[in-house]
A protein has these predicted regions:
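Structural motif
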Residues: 6-8, 149, 246
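DPxDG-like acidic metal-binding loop motif
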Residues: 100-129, 142-144
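Glycine-rich beta-strand-to-loop/alpha-helix junction loops that act as flexible
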Residues: 104-105, 242-247
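ATP-binding N-lobe of GHMP and related small-molecule kinases
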Residues: 1-100, 118, 122-128, 163-164, ...
Length: 256
């Protein structure tokens, strides 16, 4: 199964909820860049309590796919899921850069949930999978829906399909690892007074093409300023737009 990257056409902070930040954002699937995830029969049996994940890159810390697996084990299909992964491994082919604002980890978790649901015929609805994903990561819900474009709000759990007009986009990822918690913490400490609820509301109704034609990059992503405060050498040209918490940015290919 392909596990696509995402871009944030705009990302506005609208408030806080405990340690989380409420957002209003346009997410689009960026289908030119994707990881692949699939299941293969294992050569030996596992405990069924943790996944055997084979990847082309080293994954540090707690793997978000394993986190998704643990959430699935809390459902009524615990034994079917555990039994399957005693004899199967997860193969992950990574192409999406990590710490780049492209949602690679969240996309992998969603692809794992969707693929497990299909492979084991669990018949979870998208709504049920989104509920399962709430303890995994805030961007996972968008990827579960498989929408090409959506307005995402709350802390990422509200995903509304959007009939969009998306120009051809080109993505660039500089060699700067962006820590999402660090960028959000910087926004909370230094930039909360920049919240613009009126603009956040206005952007939701516009197509991606209209947004990129009408607005400046610093108006569209509230995380650009804290990212640049932490990485002062990072500069964008006028026709370049910041995605997520960085460090990736994108621009329109050709004329809009």
């Amino acid at each position: 199964m392909k596990s696509y990257a995402k871009l944030n056409i705009f990302l506005k902070i609208t408030g806080t909820r405990g340690n989380y930040h409420e957002i209003s954002s346009r997410f689009i699937l960026y289908k030119s860049l994707f990881d692949k995830i699939y299941f293969e029969k294992s050569e030996f049996q596992h405990s069924g309590e943790d996944l055997n994940i084979i990847s082309n890159i080293k994954i540090n810390g707690e793997n978000i796919i394993n986190k998704a697996f643990k959430e699935l084990l809390k459902t009524k299909f615990k034994y079917e899921i555990s039994d399957f992964f005693k004899t199967h491994k997860v193969v992950l082919e990574k192409n999406i850069p990590m710490g780049a604002g492209l949602g690679g980890g969240s996309s992998n978790a969603a692809a794992f949930l969707n693929l497990t649901n299909q492979t084991l015929n669990l018949n979870f609805s998208k709504k049920e999978l989104i509920e399962i994903s709430k303890n995994i990561g805030s961007d996972v819900a968008f990827f579960i829906t498989e929408f090409e474009s959506a307005n995402v709000s709350g802390v990422g759990e509200i995903v509304e399909n959007f009939n969009d007009d998306i120009p051809n986009l080109e993505v660039f990822t500089p060699s700067i690892f962006a820590s999402t918690p660090e960028i959000y913490a910087k926004f909370r400490s230094d930039f909360m007074d920049k919240i613009d609820l009126n603009l956040a509301k206005k952007l939701k109704s516009l197509s991606t093409k209209e947004i990129l034609k009408k607005y400046k990059n610093y108006e569209l992503n509230d995380l650009l300023a804290p990212f640049q405060a932490i990485n002062p050498n990072f500069k964008l040209k006028e026709n370049e737009f910041f995605s997520g918490s960085g460090s990736s940015y994108f621009k329109i290919k050709g004329k809009i």
